[in-house]
Each structure stands twice: as structure tokens, then as C-alpha cells.
Amino acid sequence: MTNQLFDAYFTAPAMREIFSDRGRLQGMLDFEAALARAEAAAGLVPHSAVAAIEAACKAERYDVGALANAIATAGNSAIPLVKALGKVIASGVPEAERYVHLGATSQDAMDTGLVLQLRDALDLIEADLGKLADTLSQQALKHADTPMVGRTWLQHATPVTLGMKLAGVLGALTRHRQRLQELGPPCWCCSSGGASGSLAALGSKAMPVAEALAEQLKLSLPEQPWHTQRDRLVEFASVLGLVAGSLGKFGRDVSLLMQTEAGEVFEPSAPGKGGSSTMPHKRNPVGAAVLIGAATRVPGLVSTLFAAMPQEHERSLGLWHAEWETLPDICCLVSGALRQAQVIAEGIEVDAARMRRNLDLTQGLVLAEAVSIVLARTLGRDRAHHLLEQCCQRAVAEQRHLRAVLGDDPQVSAELSAEELD
């Protein structure tokens, strides 16, 4: 659900506009206008009525508050909107009112309107993903040789580079872009099945009208009615769930690297950003929090859509209703995470000197694997691994650098010269 206090933080303005109350109404009204044009082409609606219907299909002409109250009684948003649309038309061209919503059902208007919104949402998400991918690519190249410690199980492991970490995020987002592109037109289907999805109301004109409607709205014509077959919507939401998860991983890593004990990278600073109400020294990862928050919420929302798939017969009771706010919320959360990820990627501040100090924090232990691999050539893997494990334990216990411990060990010295150890 939208919330004025938090929308600016968690969502992007352009996505909020797509799924605003006016945006939702306009999607359904676009369906009604296109339906009138399609039916006029099939000889079911006089061309003189089309202009009146089109003129009335402007969301700004309708009272959102009044419609909201009516929805609470009607059970869906299309019923009161179609009634209001008819009244507006009747006030100007009374004879055109009878042709409004001809042969359609509420779910046709709502589902098609939603698909139009989702298509716009996808355009926005794809554009933001492309921009973020370009930025991450530039930063990965810039930091291809910026060494830092790799961490496994939250412990220092072996050296990596910041460029490698950023390239990993880039790779995931590139795969998600491909997944979204593969959804393509088949995912964006209009709905024109009528009351029970059988197209019965329009008789022999039903298919020509359905084809013309799809063409008018630049949507695909489904093979069958999909009032209770929701797999396309769930597939789209699932890919957005993957996007949210990968952005959350990016945000999680950034936030961990911003910890005082690490201090290796930082979100870009700005006046008033990331401060504390009580601690003047704080620099909180407020952007990363949005990424992690979206990655936490979106999977639950996607699971709601999966749970809503076994819809009853030809129109569902409650399961369809569960989608109405869920899909927009997913899109809004992903858009907000993409916006914050772009800010982080563009302005990320890197403390390369701190990275180097952290590499040295364990006094050479991060290079133990490299020594073990070299020794394995002559000692065998298991023996070399055990030997290095003992040397590492001794280095920690004696608080000495691993290089010094290795140099003192007779088994190591027998295999590697001082120059090779260096």
C-alpha cells in the first residue's frame, strides 16, 4: 500500500505515478475507449458514439473518493467506474451511453488496465536496470585492481578485488534483464472474455472485436481467456523478485563494508543523509536499507501471488482480489531499490588504504591458501593443508606474521626458499 510518509524513501516517483489512483483509473478507461473503437470497427457501435466515449475516458473527470466509497460496496473498481462513465456520457450524448462496456466484464477492464500499467512499469524498470548496469560496469573496470579481503562465513578468507564484487552484481542484473526481455509480448495480454470468458455476448463478432482490441492497445491476444489463469502475472512478479534479491545482496554487502570495523566503502554523502537523532558521528547506510528492505518484502508479496493461483472456476473469490495491491507494491518496491542502487553505484566512496590495512589485519593468514597450493605440488594436498593449518594456528597463538612462522618451520623451509615465500 502507498503511504505518503514513506513513499519518497521506498519508491520512485515515476512508478508511483503509474500506480496512482488516477493511473489505475486511466488504465481501465483506456480499455473502455479501445473497446468502443474495436466494436465500432466490427459494426456493433456507431462511430458517432465512439467520440463521446473517448472524450469521457479521462481519469481526471472522475471523483476518486466517491469511487473508492462505491468500490467498498461493489466489490471491484470497474463496476462503479463503468457506472460513472455512463453518467458522464449520458450528460453529453445520451444515445451513446448504451454502448459503454458492451459485451465486457469487470475483470476484462481491470485486468487489461493492470497489464497496461505493468507494461509501463516494465519499461521504467528496464531503463533503470540498464542505467545501473552501465554504472556498475564502469565502476567494476575502475576497481578491477583494487585489492580487498574476501569474506566467507563473515570471516576473512582470501584476497579479491572490489571490481570482482561489483562485477558479480552486474552479472546477476544482466541475467535479470535478459529474463525480463524474454517475457516480452506474450506476457502482455488483453482480456476480453466477457462474463465467464466464453466471448458469448458478442457472438460471431467476438473474435474480430478481441483482435481489434488487442491491436488498439498494442497487446497480445491470448489463446484462451485468463480470468483465472494467472501464470503470466506471477512469472513477471517472480522475475522482479529476483531483481529485488540481487539488489538486496548489493545493499547488504555495501552496508557490511560500511561498518566501523571494516570502513572500506561508503554510500555517497549528502547534507542530512544517514545521520542519527542522537549521535552526531553516525553515517548510516540509508540507501542500502531500502535495497535490503525491498529484498525482504518482495519475496513475501510474490508468494502471495503464488498462493492466489488456484482460483475457482471462471472468476475467483478473494484470490483475484489479493493481487490488486500486491503487484503494484512489488513494482514500486523494486523501482525504489533500483533508484537507491543507482545513487550508491554512481557515488560509491572507496577507501583503498583501509582495504589494504584490512588485508594485513590477520598478518598474512589470507595468503595461507596460496602457500598451501604451492606446497601441495610436492607434499600432496592433505599434508600441505594440514601443515598450513598448524602454521596458521601457531601464528595466531604467538601473534606473529604468517610469513615469519612459515620461515621458521623446517618442513616449509625444506620445500620453499625465503625468496619464494616472499
UniProtKB/Swiss-Prot annotation:
EC code: 5.5.1.2
Top-rank taxon: Bacteria
GO cellular component: cytoplasm
The keyword Zinc-finger is annotated on this UniProt entry: no
Keywords from the named record: Aromatic hydrocarbons catabolism, Cytoplasm, Isomerase
Pathway(s) served: Aromatic compound metabolism; beta-ketoadipate pathway; 5-oxo-4,5-dihydro-2-furylacetate from 3-carboxy-cis,cis-muconate: step 1/2
Main subcellular localisation: cytoplasm
Location(s), subcellular: Cytoplasm
InterPro entries in alphabetical order: AdenyloSucc_lyase_C, Fumarate_lyase_CS, Fumarate_lyase_fam, Fumarate_lyase_N, L-Aspartase-like, Protocat_PcaB-like
Molecular-function annotations in GO: 3-carboxy-cis,cis-muconate cycloisomerase activity; lyase activity
Reaction catalysed by this enzyme: 2-(carboxymethyl)-5-oxo-2,5-dihydro-2-furoate = 3-carboxy-cis,cis-muconate + H(+)
Isomerase among keywords: yes
Enzyme category, top tier: isomerase
GO BP: 3,4-dihydroxybenzoate catabolic process; beta-ketoadipate pathway
Alphabetical list of SUPFAM superfamilies matching this protein: L-aspartase-like
Gene3D superfamilies membership: Fumarase/aspartase (C-terminal domain) (1.10.40.30), Fumarase/aspartase (Central domain) (1.20.200.10)
Family: Belongs to the class-II fumarase/aspartase family.
Quaternary organization: Homotetramer.
Its job: Catalyzes an anti cycloisomerization.
Protein name: 3-carboxy-cis,cis-muconate cycloisomerase
Organism encoding this protein: Pseudomonas putida
Gene: pcaB
